[in-house]
Amino acid sequence: MSDVAETLDPLRLPLQGERLIEASAGTGKTFTIAALYLRLLLGLGGSAAFPRPLTVEELLVVTFTEAATAELRGRIRSNIHELRIACLRETTDNPLYERLLEEIDDKAQAAQWLLLAERQMDEAAVFTIHGFCQRMLNLNAFESGMLFEQQLIEDESLLRYQACADFWRRHCYPLPREIAQVVFETWKGPQALLRDINRYLQGEAPVIKAPPPDDETLASRHAQIVARIDTVKQQWRDAVGELDALIESSGIDRRKFNRSNQAKWIDKISAWAEEETNSYQLPESLEKFSQRFLEDRTKAGGETPRHPLFEAIDQLLAEPLSIRDLVITRALAEIRETVAREKRRRGELGFDDMLSRLDSALRSESGEVLAAAIRTRFPVAMIDEFQDTDPQQYRIFRRIWHHQPETALLLIGDPKQAIYAFRGADIFTYMKARSEVHAHYTLDTNWRSAPGMVNSVNKLFSQTDDAFMFREIPFIPVKSAGKNQALRFVFKGETQPAMKMWLMEGESCGVGDYQSTMAQVCAAQIRDWLQAGQRGEALLMNGDDARPVRASDISVLVRSRQEAAQVRDALTLLEIPSVYLSNRDSVFETLEAQEMLWLLQAVMTPERENTLRSALATSMMGLNALDIETLNNDEHAWDVVVEEFDGYRQIWRKRGVMPMLRALMSARNIAENLLATAGGERRLTDILHISELLQEAGTQLESEHALVRWLSQHILEPDSNASSQQMRLESDKHLVQIVTIHKSKGLEYPLVWLPFITNFRVQEQAFYHDRHSFEAVLDLNAAPESVDLAEAERLAEDLRLLYVALTRSVWHCSLGVAPLVRRRGDKKGDTDVHQSALGRLLQKGEPQDAAGLRTCIEALCDDDIAWQTAQTGDNQPWQVNDVSTAELNAKTLQRLPGDNWRVTSYSGLQQRGHGIAQDLMPRLDVDAAGVASVVEEPTLTPHQFPRGASPGTFLHSLFEDLDFTQPVDPNWVREKLELGGFESQWEPVLTEWITAVLQAPLNETGVSLSQLSARNKQVEMEFYLPISEPLIASQLDTLIRQFDPLSAGCPPLEFMQVRGMLKGFIDLVFRHEGRYYLLDYKSNWLGEDSSAYTQQAMAAAMQAHRYDLQYQLYTLALHRYLRHRIADYDYEHHFGGVIYLFLRGVDKEHPQQGIYTTRPNAGLIALMDEMFAGMTLEEA
């Protein structure tokens, strides 16, 4: 195989067999894919063409992100459309289409074919790798052994945490105290362990180098380590009296091993040697008496002090005293197995599972049948961003298309831009593929950047023969496109070099000083550019065309959120507006989320003074303490606010949460007030984002109370991995953009700053790839040779990151350089710059001092590359010129549409304003109302368990996840308490409480929850009841009062006339002795003990909150469901009744307490069925 790549002509590339196309940054990869796509659609290319034209459904394009998929699909659709127009007109000014037209004989027929393709683009086979695997598994379910009805889960982090907590509980809880202490010194808990191993739980498992024996236990490892330490302690005690004389008579260099320190060291070690061994920590001074250290401190030609003790210390220090490798090896295997087992139990698939399932299926006995089926469907596959592949993905592609007749596999990517190792991408897989695919092509023209930018990158990466450290990743210089030859960046009348290095003065500097200084230099330079741009003195030129530099032209590329914060702070100090484009925080972690919760609680219950006062005190409402105090002292003014919030409550019930929030924000001028404050645009964006999430969740939940619970839960457990929760960009208009290098890949910016590009982080974990097999290897003992290999891979990836960063800029790139020293202690002499990517290229991998670094930079400089001393300037802020804007007027809405169709719920029908029943029961605590009470009694009971929205949700969730037939596991309860944010002291109470609930007889049949198997119960049964004609509160209320004595004593129903769908969730539906029952859990607090939960008290609670309407609606829903599912269904025979379980009142000593049962009249359910179907009811 030749390493020389052929320059690619997209219109002459042979479209059969396997081809590897390496597309350097800015060389038109997307353009090339689109051109090849058009050729394949029309069968163009002469002898290099595919044997026949293909449809969009036969042409597979695989890329690695949803965004790239959408971009490619749009680009291909646009090209198909434009070529079709060119065929119809038989002329074009597009060079690509012009060449294609020359090959098309029948342009009218080609136009028809392209029109068909354009119309079918929604069905085009453009997928992410995971989307491709999922589709192949589903379409070939029998060949792949794929189960039907499997749910795809995007995020497995919670599953992995639960599996890790389970591992910790099984292995660490039973440990003796002395071993548990050692484990605790390494990891404080399961979260810390998971942080250490999380990256190795995704994708294929790495090979463990020198794994511990299968039969080794923590106890045996601990005993072995303690014995080794105790042996050295005994040797020290035996020999310590001889050490002074032995060392004194040797050739030790007393300048490096002085007597005063020697005495201190001996005292410290002697004290340690007398102690019982409870820790693996060794005294730092023990190393001073190792044979190796003493040899280093002996004078030249002098006699080294020697003793068996020194050799024993050498051996003790040479081998790790750790249980880390043992715990991690077991954890990796067991957690992977636990997660896989749990996903099988739930019928779930993760993204990695789709890859492994298809990979396994293709390697099975029927694998060739599956491969043939996929090849038949997709004769041609183009794999975009192939440098980000992994071993499984490559095996899949190779198994399907390798050496197959009348197929093509086109692998397209740039190994120089492989920067996603943290996501599982594996550059070594690319290197293996490169050695196995013999046809290599390259794109040789950069269409993005100015000639100076292209030349400077070429020159920098040509400083060494192995710029990217591996011969399989060569650097091939590229040309600058003709269209870009006139691009220039002019500042104060002078054309600027394309690349400029800002070098800090001094012999050395630490990371903190480097980042602080460079952030200031970067901000000051950006300010100067912007001020010059306002004067017309900073211009982006293209020939005679020029435009002044604006803030949005400038991007600062960083490695982390911490670096972004430093740059943003420096820009803010100079009053330069900026935006961080890589923020992945959850919006539920913001103050706005908490304030939104208080606001919703106030709208839901404006009668509660404390709740309303909390909402008014939020920063988004804009009131100060004096305003609130004035309201407190003015009863009339307070009543006006209560009425205002009651109005919002009505809007919420009738139209939803977002219209309510819009009305509130409009009435209170919240948007205007926020935008007038610093950071207001960011806060307003978060409020609107949360509003959208609330609106979406509200369509899936049955009541306003449930929505408040939902928000409360997400604030307690935000998930920054969920894309819907990640904070949105407030604005990038006229702002300096700060973005991570990873996020910038594939993008371009006119002007780029890399302030911290000299920084690096030495690899600490010995995770690397075998240089022969390319297998991923994890050395948990961190042998020096393993660490060296891992460090080499770290540096190689940093070089690829540098390449990506430098190739983002169109006109100019500035770099912050410093004589960086990361080591502690003496910082004179050689710096550590050569360990960074930029330093390796500048210094050709050799250590240099600050003067040597400067010499290397000077040697690199030419017309395109320059350097300047970095000095922090003044803090003069940027003065923005006033920009006049045209006054805009919104068009006035001329009519209001009338539509009362909506999705509502039981809660939406029964909720109303403050009622008499609520006054009569002041201690009643509904699931989502009230606040947690302070526990004062010394003995904990279920009645003291916290009350409020979150505890109510927590109690419900316990019964959703529980296997009723099994004993309650205290460890499971403890874990649930921890996840729910409750103290572990509740575990015994909760375990006994749940057991009592499960074993309590529910009705006269004696059935209990503990008797219900999984096949006889349905948890959280969702239903929709159509409301065909407008439902009127008074008519429904009259009907149910006529048939149900409980309803007759209830407050009147009040709700707006509604038509549409009524949605709800039944906590539990179960079958017993052929009859079906519905059960609802209630966490209401009725009193201090179970005696408060009498039938009369529970009936009063049912009436006060109109639970009668709830069970009537639920019964109607279940009645309709059973009528369609059971052939000979009869309400009287099949429906057993309703059970309301007041959880706090269930008491095994008093079986009737806490359980309310009823059974709606059959006539009532029949008439409700007619009413909801839109039929007119006869007068009773």
From Swiss-Prot:
Domain UvrD-like helicase C-terminal: 480-746
Domain of life: Bacteria
Gene of this entry: recB
Protein known as: RecBCD enzyme subunit RecB
Residue ranges, annotated region (ATPase, DNA-binding and helicase activity, interacts with RecC): 2-853
PROSITE patterns: UVRD_HELICASE_ATP_BIND (PS51198), UVRD_HELICASE_CTER (PS51217)
Activity control: After reacting with DNA bearing a Chi site the holoenzyme is disassembled and loses exonuclease activity, DNA unwinding and Chi-directed DNA cleavage; RecB remains complexed with ssDNA, which may prevent holoenzyme reassembly. High levels of Mg(2+) (13 mM MgCl(2+)) or incubation with DNase allows holoenzyme reassembly, suggesting it is DNA bound to RecB that prevents reassembly. (Microbial infection) RecBCD is inhibited by the lambda virus gam protein (both GamL and GamS isoforms); in vitro a short preincubation prior to adding DNA results in maximal inhibition.
Cellular component per GO, a single term: exodeoxyribonuclease V complex
Outcome of swapping residue 803 to H: Large decrease in recombination, loss of Chi hotspot activity, decreased RecB helicase rate, retains nuclease activity but not Chi-sequence specificity, does not load RecA
Domain UvrD-like helicase ATP-binding span(s) in chain numbering: 2-450
GO MF entries: 3'-5' DNA helicase activity; ATP binding; ATP hydrolysis activity; ATP-dependent activity, acting on DNA; DNA binding; DNA endonuclease activity; DNA helicase activity; DNA translocase activity
